[in-house]
Amino acid sequence: MAIRGHKGLQQLLSMATSVNSFLGPMKSYKFIFDQITHESILTSSSFRLLENLDLTSAIGQLLNETIQAHHKSYKTGTTTLFFMVGAWSSAVQECLHLGIPVSLIVSVMLDGLNSCIGHVHSLQVSLVSQVTSDCTNIKTNGINHSNYSASGDQGNCSSELENNPLPRVSNMRTASEFPVAFHKKPLPLCTGTNLYKTQRRRLFHSRHLAEDLSFFQDVPERPQTTTLNNETLDGLAKGLAHGYQPVMNLVKNAVCLHCAEIKENSLDKSSFNISRLETCSLPGLSEEHTTVSFGYTTLVPTESAAVITHLNGKPLRILLVDGELTESHRHLGFDNPDNVKMVFEHAGNEKHNLEDSWISRAYEKIIQANINLILVRGDVCPFLLKQCIHRNILIVTQVKQNILQAFSECTGAEPVTYLTQINCCSVGNEAFVTLCTRANSIIEVSQKIVISITAKKLNLITATLSSRIPSTMQSIEDQFLTCAYRLHHALQEGNVFYGGGAIELLCIHHLQKLVQESSSSFYAYDNAQFHCLSSWMTESATFYRAAIIGCLAKGWYKYISVLLCNMGGFLSELDAVTFIENELQNISHHSSPIDYVRDQYSKKDLFNDEMGISISHHSLPVYDNVTPKLEAWRRALHLVLTVLQTDAEVITNSATQNQILMSETSNGEYLFL
């Protein structure tokens, strides 16, 4: 089949090359310029970059749906997914250039990936059941939450935590010291060879790429893994920082403050709720304003300053509105009568009178309930907002649902959708509001002021992020959320992978071992799978298997080489590939490849002194999340193979290759969804 006809694969490869500089700890930032608004932002996020690419084509939409689905599920790993889409698109094109049938490419590549996933599970690092979070030493680390009292005397927002300024863009390549983190106990090796010889063959290939692909995990039970002992949250956070060390320090401080509030000295998946971690961005302010605080920190119009001063320190009655406070806000099931036309003598005045009437009723409801503070998920009518300000009632708009839920749990307020639902159960008590100040001055950003809202037993932490360069604000917020979710996934799963290319290197070695196998059982396995097919199909599967697996491995070759170059260890990809070949030889000569990789990457330096990055005399292992990494591989390969099949059907105007693989007499079970 002519490779030039596979336009879809070529488009994937073209779009994926834009994220090469985003791999590794030393990322090269990209400016994104909006030709309509003439504004620009600075980003190192493949997810943000995708939002600004031309995705009008069918291939672009498929790529967008795949990455959007992955980002929605994990909030991390999108760069790996994006990069591997390009790497495996190139690998598939090479297979087509060799004249390999599409059906064999799909079958062997999926088998190879599943085999690798089963094999690398042995390289997992198991966290202890409870990771000590050092919360007992919070005050010595700079966190001071004693300013919050039950009476609502919160003090200045800038005093809760010692300032942890984020570096400027020019200093983003500076990393802090990396002490040795984990002590391990080697366990017996569990190899992945002959992984699927006792299993039925299942080939899943879905075009519904926006669905969660976790059910594709067709691997054996997880083997025993290395255990982390005597480890603190500090070491785990540094291993997952991936070059975002200052931002990860902020995440670590937020988690410690959270543990202190719930009075826990240890951290596990039940005590760290990622939905109770919020951010507040202050573009244009110095990095000294960056801090972590207890409660909900947000921005409100400067007109509310007098109201907040009046309410400061007083226990407030709070209302939570899970909707909008506007006259036009209607129930989702409300429809205007069909074929009915409303005619008024003075249409403009009538509309104005209707809005005035609604504002009067809404204002009366609020006054009757004696409400001081209203948190609204949506927008608020400006006229109602002004009336409430005159009555010293504070209204905060655009409040996320998880924040409403947090205040509902601690104040007893039940969220309402409309003001007509207000009753004695829907109003909460004991909420407090204060102005955030620095050096006795109110913090003001773009005609808005910073406030903090707290309550007794409120399970909510806010990270206030600031930068003098407004264009970097989105990037800093993305980095914070990425680090937070990495730590969240690690604690939820209780396992991490060694990073820095460790599992990719093990996958390459495993695939090379599969290629080199020539035992009778290997060929018997092939013949058993294709016994119902023609001898040509059987011979082709055996003949092309090595080439297909080799192309699959080249995707990980590309990943590791770009990663090593971006880490500053090598000046060119050729030098990085030479290093990879040497490492593969060392692995092959070792009696236990997994033990070799574990030993090497548990003490491997992440940075290079020649790049001007300060490192300590000790090293810290780099870690990757387990499920986000594996799902990124799965989604990437499934997207590439979907495009491959679609291209093949367009070129040949036939789907005969599917009919062969879906034969009812076949011993293997192939599912094309």
Swiss-Prot record:
InterPro entries cross-referenced by the UniProt entry: BBS12 (IPR042984), Cpn60/GroEL/TCP-1 (IPR002423), GroEL-like_apical_dom_sf (IPR027409), GROEL-like_equatorial_sf (IPR027413), TCP-1-like_intermed_sf (IPR027410)
Keyword annotations of the record: Cell projection, Cilium
Sample GO molecular function, one term: ATP binding
Principal location listed in the UniProt entry: other
Role, per record: Component of the chaperonin-containing T-complex (TRiC), a molecular chaperone complex that assists the folding of proteins upon ATP hydrolysis.
Family assignment from sequence similarity: Belongs to the TCP-1 chaperonin family. BBS12 subfamily.
Protein name (Swiss-Prot/TrEMBL): Chaperonin-containing T-complex member BBS12
